[in-house]
Structures are given as C-alpha cells and as structure tokens.
C-alpha cells in the first residue's frame, strides 16, 4: 500500500504509461515522499554531514548534499536532498485525483485520441506541449456578413452604427441605452505570477474552436511557460563553479562571504554572479542550451543529475496549461481565447522574476573592447582570474564586511589602434543605400528634416500681441504666454462644438512650474459639479503612449471672465488633424454625391483617383489599434476616435487627442460607486468608431460612412484594396453578438505590422545619421567660439599687444590659414571642407605639419597641429583663469 497520497511504488516509474524520463528523474526523488522510504531511492547516497555534526553549522546551508539530521530520521519528509530535486509527478507517476498523463496544475501527458476533447475534462490534457487538440480550423468558422461572399445587410450592422455619424455628441459608438452582456473571458496564457493567485475565480469562456484566430491558440500551445517562479539567491560557495577540496578549511569557515577568498588555496576560479536557484517551479521551463551557461569546471554541476540528452524529454511533460486543467481556476479575468491574450492580460505576460529594464542604457564605447591594464592587475588580494574574460575579482574588507568587485580599468588591446578623430567616418552603408537623393548633404542634416524642426520651433516660441487680442488672458492658473492654436470663437457664438456639445477653444501655454509648453483645451461655460470624475482623470494621467496625447491635469478657472474647465495636454508642435489633411477636399465626395433629378450623371471618377495608398491606411490602423489597446488595457475607453481629434505629426505619425474629455463632461452622478461601470460599452463603441475612421480613409471621404452610401463604399474598397482591409472594416462595423477586443483585429493586420516596424526602424537610422552630423558640427562650433575669444583681443592684463605675441600670434596666423586663403589669381578661396578638416586636425592634435605665413609674407612658421593645440589650450585656460579672478 502506498503512503504518498496515491503514488505508486518506485517500480511504477518504469510503467509503460510514464515517459522514458522516469528512470533519469527517479534517482533524485526526495526521501520520505510518495511512499519512498528514506534512502530507498536508487543511486542516491544519503550521508550525514560531518561539518554539521561537528560545529552544528554548514557553509552550504540548505544546499548541502548531505543530511543535517541523524540519518535514522531520513524517512521523515523534508530531509536529505533539498528543493532542487525533481518531483515524482514529473517522472510519470500519477498524482492523486488525476489519471495517468495528466499533471496537476495544468501539465499534460501524451496527446489524447479524440480530435476535439471536452475542455472541461481535467484529464484530457488538452493543449499539451506538442500534442493535444489542434482545434481551431476544424470547428465552424466565424460568420461575418460581407466576408467570403456573404451579403452585407442593414440587419448585420450594429444598432449604433447609423445612430450617429462622426458629427454628434454620441458619434463615437453605441448609445448608452444599448446594453451588452459583460462576459469575462480568459486566455490560455498564464505566465503572469501577479495574475495567478489562489483567490482568482474561474470565468466562462467561449469555445476557441469557433474563433477565427484559434490557430493562434494552437501555435502557442507548445510554448513552455512557467506559472510561478520563486527566485532564491545563491551565496558565495553555492555557485556552480565551486571546487573546494573535501578536506579544505573553507568548509569550516564562519564568514559566509570571504571564507573562500581567505582559506581556499586551490586557486580554482569562482564565478562571482548571482545565480537563480533551480527549483521545481523553475524546472517547468527547461533550457535545451543550458550547457552554454553551466561553468565547465572540474566539478560536477548540480544539474548533472539530469543529463543533457534527457532535457529534450521535458518538452512532453512541461506543456502549456490546458484549458481543462485545474489551473484554469487561477487565470485572470479579461482574457480572450478568440485572439490570444486580451489587452487586460497582454502587457503582464512578463514574469516578475525577469530582469528589470534599465532606464539608462550603457553607451557603447571603446572600453568595452579593452581589458584591465597590467597596473590594475597587480593587486594585493586577488581572488581569482578567469582566463577567458581576463577580469580579476578583488576583495576588500571595510568595517568587518567583505566586498568583492571586478577591476575594469580599460587598457587597449595589443595591436588595436583607434583613430585620432580628425577624419569623418563615412555614411553607414545601410543608410547610404536608402538615400532618396543622390546629392544629399554630407556635413548637415537633410533640408526636409531641418525645415520641419525649424517650423516646430517657430510654433513653440510663437506669441501674440496682447493689444490685438485682449480677450486672451495673460495668465491662467499656473500657465502664461497663451497663444491660440485655433481661431477664437466670436463672443456671440451660439453654435456649440459638434463633438463635445460645448463651445471649445485651444491654446498653447507655458507652465510656470517647469517652463514647458502645453496645450490647453478650454470648455466654455462648464461648471464642474461632481469631483468624483477626477478618479478617471488620474487614470488618464498614468497612460504614456507614443500614439496618445498625454493628459497632464484638469482644472477650473474664471480667468476667461466665465467659468471654464481646462484640460492640459502635451504640446506637439506642427500637428494637424486627420480631418484637415485627408478630408478637406470638397471634390473627394463626388463619387457618392447624387445629381438632381432630370440631370444626366457624368462619368464616375477614375477608380484610383484621390484614394490613399493601402500602405498608409495600414500604418494608421497599426497606430490607432495600438493606442486603443493601451487605453482598454488601463480599463478606460477612448471615446474620441474621430478624424477631428486625431493629430498627424510628420508624415504618418498619429496621436489620439482630447482623451478624457468625455469622461468628465458626461460623468453621471449615479456612477459615484463605480465610475467604470459603462466602460465595457464604451470600449465596444471605440471599435465601431475605429471601423468608421478606416472606412472613411479607404474612401477618402466622410460621405462613405453614411448609411445610404455604405454599399457603394464597400464596393469601392473591394475594387481598390485587399480583402484583408475589407474584412477588417466589416468586422469592426458588424455585430458579432459577443464582446469584442481590439486584439481580434491583430490577425487581420498580420505581417503588415512588421512592415511598419521596419519602416520605423529605417527612419530611425536616417535620423541617427543626421544627428551624428550635427554632433560634429556642434563640436566645431565650440572650437570656433573658443578661438574667437583669443584672436584680435584688443587688450589683456593691460597688454595691448597680447594677441599679437607668443602663442597668440600662431593662433592668429592659423585663423588666416583657415578663412583667408586666396587663389593664384588673388581671388578668395572658399572651401568648407578645408575649414572642417583643419579644425578637426586642431581638435585632435595630429602630428601633421602646417606652414603658417605672415600677412606681409616675410616669415613662414612650420608647426604641427599638436603644437597649435597646446598653444590653444594654454591660452584659453589663461583667459578662463582671468575671468574667474584667479590672476
């Protein structure tokens, strides 16, 4: 009879139902667990630790391979080998309550026979690593009207699609009275430890077999994702490279840090890194290439109990948690099977044990290619030196605490010669081959980029004449220097904003607290009654995204002679709305405009006339969907997905503007207890608004989104664009009778996402190349500024001839050599490359000789650039000392 809660005797490990890994794993089973008596495991020699028996302490602590108690008590659980052993459940032995092939916590055994197993059965082992049901493609496909020949009818559209267009207060989604059932969904990815807790409740999920993106479920089903990791740190001596003789005094040392440095005389290298302990939770993700990271010392690694050849067998045991396993109860809400990870889960897939991102990256420098110099290696207490790395680990004791550090004093490698930096490097080849113009400037940034930056600077520094615009206050709260970005509404204006239902105006202003420019969106005549909406404002402040204009603060003011509500956003100079860039042409609606009765209709416009390139539309889709994904992940809704509220900076960079305005203007007092009660409906409305924006872009006209023109608009899209774009529009505009997620359109975007990523990185390469030119230009300007403070100085220290004597005279002749060259005919010789080359040689101090001729041509001085640099530095330091009062 078994005493381990249903575990079989050790002989069961070799049963046919278990994997071939059982024989290799069973040798490290802990004693006293699962009915295996202490010391009965094959291949394990349980001995009493002689160091613990003598001093009642052991250097290795819990990591010691020997017992710290009397061997007679070895049958008690928890003794003998420690937590680095592999549990018997991994050796193919069934666990109580689970049939063979199923592992508690979501593990799976061999793939079952049925093709579509019941997801609720915990023993089917669905979605096992490399096995399980393929699903997805065999189930019924998601029927979307208009796709694959399906007819697009009015009944297939959402009720809110035709309720309003872009123009209107509620034109961004479904009406509030339309109630959608809030269905919590879950995903098959459960790698976030923060979401996996014992108190999580199970949530219902729709059948992934009917999902159009269920292939994603199968593609990611073979991933080995560990659910929890409990990192533990190794002390010095618990590392893999320790080679301490059994008779060494290092084992008896009391100092847990410096004992090996003081008493170990074997000279064996010791790896001075923190090593994450390999626990049974960490073993759920075996690394086939772990041998590359295991030190190749003379000792046997702790992982050697499981041979490298058997590591591949773990792929059948450690599988993705199946939906039918008890681990389903630990999944977090807000996860979707239809499109992989939902926005509530996707940003949290990184385990908390992963390395934290470095906010300050290390700048590459030549020191990374250097080794410690010979002077730095002659230390008093060298611990060890790794021959491969050439780094010396040194020990220093301060106040009884021993510190270990690695000396990284750089010294050039043998045979390595660095340039003296007086010659410009050529353009990077990957940038040179993508240059659109053959005559691109060599020393300055591109004219197009320069002009764009200058325009942004002009707009940022623009101010108004207060006498001409007295209606604009000089200061509003902590903001000053207001500049209207839109034409100010007349004082007697009655027409309200078509978007927010209030009269609005926009200003650029500078904050007195940080002197940074911001964009102020003023809501005229609004009185803030309930401050509970500030909870949503605080949530918006935390959102930082490249495609969202960040909200900084909201305040009320009476500086405009009436109560006003002001939203402060980041200011993006030079931005224009999508409406003004793409929908400002009145002739673009000719395709949808009907002529009067009795008039002959002229020929339809050419198919491609005035239409946007599909690549541009997909670039917009990627950015807008990315913004929606971030907003929905934060538990908020955009509600301003409108061409008038989407900013375009540069060529294709989008930013969603005016976020959070609707959350304050339409805040319901009945939502005091739960301000996020209606966010699920608003998020569904965001997807409909996104579909309308994409359809308007595809038609290049706002008339295409009207109900009477919808069929004609879809025909235009079908003729001129790909089926993927048509299907995406239909998916966003049709009612799917279920809660949708922005992640559902990611499979439709497909590989076009990589196209946009590639274009963005290529653009970054070009801008970095232009920046490199300006870095050199700034250095040369500072050099000229220093040179100008020396040349032709009328008097210094009461010496009127100071600039004409000594080292200053050489610098004066060098100035003539730079700028006052003439041709043989006596004409001025203007050569920018000559000036740049000579300045770079002066800055580098090259040993090249130069002939300096006096103005009367009676004397010639031959000096080197290194001599000129010495004269230049000494003279400038003399000026600095006099300016600081040190002379």
UniProtKB/Swiss-Prot annotation:
A motif (PABPC-interacting motif-2 (PAM-2)) lies at residues 284-299. ATP binds at residues 521, 570-577, 644-645. Residues 298-307, 363-392 have a biased composition (Polar residues). Residues 790-887 are annotated as: Knob domain. It holds the Pfam family Pan3_PK. Changing residue 203 to A: Reduces interaction with polyadenylate-binding protein. Residues 751-789 form a coiled coil. HAMAP family: PAN3. It is found in: Cytoplasm, P-body. The N-terminal zinc finger binds to poly(A) RNA. Residues 147-498 are annotated as: Necessary and sufficient for interaction with PABPC1 but not needed for interaction with PAN2. Belongs to the protein kinase superfamily. PAN3 family. Residues 122-138 have a biased composition (Gly residues). A zinc finger (C3H1-type) spans 43-71. Homodimer. Forms a heterotrimer with a catalytic subunit PAN2 to form the poly(A)-nuclease (PAN) deadenylation complex. Interacts (via PAM-2 motif) with poly(A)-binding protein PABPC1 (via PABC domain), conferring substrate specificity of the enzyme complex. Interacts with the GW182 family proteins TNRC6A, TNRC6B and TNRC6. Interacts with YTHDF3. GO terms for biological process: deadenylation-dependent decapping of nuclear-transcribed mRNA; mRNA processing; nuclear-transcribed mRNA poly(A) tail shortening; positive regulation of cytoplasmic mRNA processing body assembly; protein targeting. Keywords: ATP-binding, Coiled coil, Cytoplasm, Metal-binding, mRNA processing, Nucleotide-binding, Nucleus, Phosphoprotein, Zinc, Zinc-finger. Residues 463-750 are annotated as: Pseudokinase domain. The modification Phosphoserine is found at residues 354, 361. GO terms for molecular function: ATP binding; poly(A) binding; protein kinase activity; zinc ion binding. Residues 102-147, 284-307, 325-392 are annotated as: Disordered. Regulatory subunit of the poly(A)-nuclease (PAN) deadenylation complex, one of two cytoplasmic mRNA deadenylases involved in general and miRNA-mediated mRNA turnover. PAN specifically shortens poly(A) tails of RNA and the activity is stimulated by poly(A)-binding protein (PABP). PAN deadenylation is followed by rapid degradation of the shortened mRNA tails by the CCR4-NOT complex. This is PAN2-PAN3 deadenylation complex subunit PAN3. One of its GO terms (cellular component) is nucleus. The lineage of its organism: Eukaryota, Metazoa, Chordata, Craniata, Vertebrata. InterPro entries: Kinase-like_dom_sf, PAN3, Pan3_PK, Prot_kinase_dom, Znf_CCCH, Znf_CCCH_sf.
């Amino acid at each position: 009879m078994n005493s381990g809660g249903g575990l079989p005797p050790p002989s069961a490990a070799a049963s046919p139902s278990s994997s071939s890994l059982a024989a290799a794993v069973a040798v490290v089973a802990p004693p006293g667990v699962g009915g295996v008596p202490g010391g009965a495991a094959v291949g394990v020699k349980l001995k009493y630790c002689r160091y613990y028996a003598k001093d009642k302490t052991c250097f290795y602590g819990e990591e010691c391979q020997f017992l710290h108690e009397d061997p007679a008590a070895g049958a008690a659980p928890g003794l003998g080998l420690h937590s680095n052993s592999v549990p018997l459940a991994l050796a193919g032995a069934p666990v109580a309550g689970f049939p063979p092939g199923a592992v508690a916590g979501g593990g799976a055994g061999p793939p079952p026979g049925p093709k579509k197993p019941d997801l609720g059965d915990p023993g089917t082992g669905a979605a096992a690593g490399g096995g399980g049901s393929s699903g997805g493609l065999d189930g019924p496909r998601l029927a979307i009207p208009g796709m694959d020949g399906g007819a697009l009818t009015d009944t297939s559209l959402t009720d809110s699609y035709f309720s309003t267009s872009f123009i209107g207060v509620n034109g961004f989604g479904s009406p509030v009275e339309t109630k959608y059932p809030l269905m919590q969904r879950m995903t098959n990815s459960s790698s976030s430890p923060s979401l996996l807790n014992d108190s999580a409740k199970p949530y219902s999920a729709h059948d992934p077999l009917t999902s159009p993106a269920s292939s994603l479920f199968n593609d990611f089903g073979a991933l080995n994702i560990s659910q929890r990791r409990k990192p533990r740190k190794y002390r010095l001596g618990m590392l893999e490279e320790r080679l301490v003789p059994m008779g060494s005094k290092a084992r008896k040392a009391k100092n847990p840090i410096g004992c090996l440095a003081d008493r170990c005389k074997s000279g064996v290298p010791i790896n001075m890194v923190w090593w994450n302990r390999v626990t049974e939770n960490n073993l759920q993700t075996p690394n086939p290439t772990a041998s590359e990271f295991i030190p190749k010392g003379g000792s046997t690694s702790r992982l050697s109990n499981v041979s490298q050849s058997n590591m591949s067998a773990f792929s059948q045991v450690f599988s993705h948690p199946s939906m039918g396993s008890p681990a389903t109860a630990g999944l977090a809400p807000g996860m979707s099977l239809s499109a992989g990870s939902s926005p509530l889960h996707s940003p949290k897939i990184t385990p908390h044990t992963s390395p934290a991102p470095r906010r300050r990256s290390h700048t590459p420098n030549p020191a990374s290619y250097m080794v410690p110099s010979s002077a730095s290696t002659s230390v008093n207490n060298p611990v060890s030196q790794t021959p491969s790395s050439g780094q010396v680990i040194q020990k220093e004791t301060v106040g009884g605490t021993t510190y270990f550090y690695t000396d990284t004093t750089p010294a050039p490698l043998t045979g390595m010669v660095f340039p003296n930096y007086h010659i410009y490097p050529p353009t990077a080849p990957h940038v040179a081959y993508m240059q659109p113009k053959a005559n691109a400037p060599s020393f300055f940034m591109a004219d197009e980029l320069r002009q764009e930056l200058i325009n942004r600077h002009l707009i940022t520094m623009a101010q108004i004449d207060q006498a001409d615009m007295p209606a604009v206050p000089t200061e509003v709260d902590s903001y000053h220097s207001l500049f209207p970005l839109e034409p100010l509404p007349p004082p007697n204006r009655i027409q309200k904003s078509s978007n927010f239902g209030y009269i609005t105006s926009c200003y650029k202003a500078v904050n007195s607290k940080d002197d940074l420019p911001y964009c102020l969106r003023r809501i005229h005549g609004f009185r803030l009654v309930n401050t509970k909406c500030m909870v949503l404002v605080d949530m918006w402040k935390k959102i930082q995204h490249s495609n969202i204009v960040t909200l900084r603060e909201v305040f009320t003011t009476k500086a405009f002679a009436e109560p006003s509500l002001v939203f402060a956003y980041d200011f993006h100079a030079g931005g224009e709305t999508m409406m003004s860039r793409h929908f400002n042409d009145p002739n673009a609606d000719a395709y949808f405009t009907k002529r009067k009765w009795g008039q002959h209709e002229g020929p339809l416009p050419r198919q491609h006339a005035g239409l946007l390139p599909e690549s541009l539309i997909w670039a917009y889709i990627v950015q807008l969907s990315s913004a929606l994904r971030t907003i929905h992940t934060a538990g908020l809704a955009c509600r301003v997905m409108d061409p008038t509220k989407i900013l375009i900076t540069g060529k294709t960079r989008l930013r969603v503007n005016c976020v959070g305005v609707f959350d304050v203007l339409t805040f319901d007092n009945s939502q005091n207890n739960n301000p996020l009660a209606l966010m699920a409906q608003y998020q569904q409305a965001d997807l409909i608004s996104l579909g309308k924006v994409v359809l308007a872009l595809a038609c290049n006209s706002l008339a295409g989104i009207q109900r009477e023109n919808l069929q004609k608009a879809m025909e235009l899209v079908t003729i001129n664009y790909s089926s993927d774009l048509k299907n995406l529009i239909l998916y966003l505009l049709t009612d799917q009778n279920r809660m949708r997620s922005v992640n559902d359109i990611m499979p439709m975007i497909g590989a076009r996402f990589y196209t946009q990523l590639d274009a963005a990185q290529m653009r970054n390469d070009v801008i970095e190349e232009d920046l490199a030119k300006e870095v050199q230009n700034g250095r040369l300007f500072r050099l000229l500024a220093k040179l100008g403070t020396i040349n032709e100085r009328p008097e210094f220290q009461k010496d009127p001839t100071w600039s004409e004597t000594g080292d200053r005279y050489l610098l004066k002749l060098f100035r003539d050599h730079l700028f006052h060259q003439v041709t043989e005919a006596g004409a001025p010789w203007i050569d920018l490359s000559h000036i740049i080359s000579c300045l770079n040689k002066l800055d580098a101090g090259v040993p090249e000789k130069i002939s300096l001729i006096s103005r009367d041509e009676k004397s010639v001085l031959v000096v080197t650039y290194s001599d000129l640099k010495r004269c230049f530095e000494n003279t400038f330091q003399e000026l600095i000392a006099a300016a600081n009062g040190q002379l």
